[in-house]
Amino acid sequence: MNDLNDRRFWIAKEEEIMQGKTTDVYFLYTKQVLEYAKMNPRVTIEVFARHVKDNWGIVLGIYEVAKLLEGKDVNVKAMDEGEIFLTSQSPIYEPVMQIEANYADIAILENPILGFLCSSSGIASKAARIRLAAGDKVLLFSFGTRRAHPALAPMIERAIYIAGFDGVSNVLASELMHIDAVGTMPHALILAFGDQRDAWKAFDAAMPEYVKRIALIDTLYDEKIEAIMALEALGKRLYGVRLDTPSSRRGNMRKIVEEIRWELSIRDGGHVKIFVSGGLDEQEIVELRDVVDGFGVGTSVSASPPIDFSFKIVEVNGRPIAKRGDVAGRKSVYRRGFNDIVTLADSKVARYLEEHGYEPLLKDLIVDGKVVREFKSIEQLRLDVKKRLNEFSKAEHSVSWML
């Protein structure tokens, strides 16, 4: 195969995304047909999902859509970055975003708009579910970007961190978020030394003090034996131990962890924290959360399925219209507690809901091409998502509609 002549890797450049080159070809056909017919209708488009696990998710990617559409002839309303959105079995959905634009101009940007929202939201939603499964007292670290396309690593880690993980391992993502990367040591380091104790002692000698001494304890011997060896090698400098045993040979992980905790404690190692990684999902986390201090979660979150958002016209030149199976007209979403009501925008019902304590979820993002929303810092987003998830986990939730 011949080399690419303008890039090293099979990835889109930022300017190519902005120009709509990552679109599907039938949108180019559509644009050409509209230009031929001298048509460019003003449309309202809504982005929504119908089927999401447990009927809720975290919407993320709003910031990137704003950067994509900034300066264009568009008006955009959207939920807040990190907001919880709801779905139901009803055909009446709640949009997470609403775009008013000339269709010939916006059509080729459907792919990147959906891509930004679907990918980030899918990862954030999975990370939020894992956070809820773990509870507030257990640490969660993201270790999964090695199995994702490297160009996507910052997006993946941002979504995971905002959704409630305590740290991420990817270096570039950490730099972009202005946080310290977190990590332990790989099996490869221990194999390179050929002796666990030599590797642990070298790690302790080489690493600056702010790097926690977490010994990997399942490379060559039984986990209990290596845990005792690590404590003997590093003593009070040993912050924690990590078990990364594959599920194919780990046995009953809870019993292994409890055995290690006992053996460390009777040797004055009660200070040593226990971390588990390797093939973890919500079920395993629930089973272990009361006996471990933290989890390293990889592929189950970094390779999360995207949210299946749709991008549908609901109004053309001010006239409500929609394809079969969708519902026409610009909509507003109002929330009180986590009971959401969908209605037509600018209607008497909308005004009634606002007057009776319901919060509008679709807010101005772009007005006449200008971004009018001030985006929050990543740390503030994390705090907001944490607060919302805590409230949500204790509340009933529903979606209904009213006209």
Question: Where are each of the predicted segments found?
Answer:
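Ordered alpha/beta subdomains of enzyme catalytic regions
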Residues: 1-211, 237, 310-403
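Glycine-rich phosphate/ribose-binding loops and adjacent secondary-structure elements
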Residues: 3, 184, 188-345
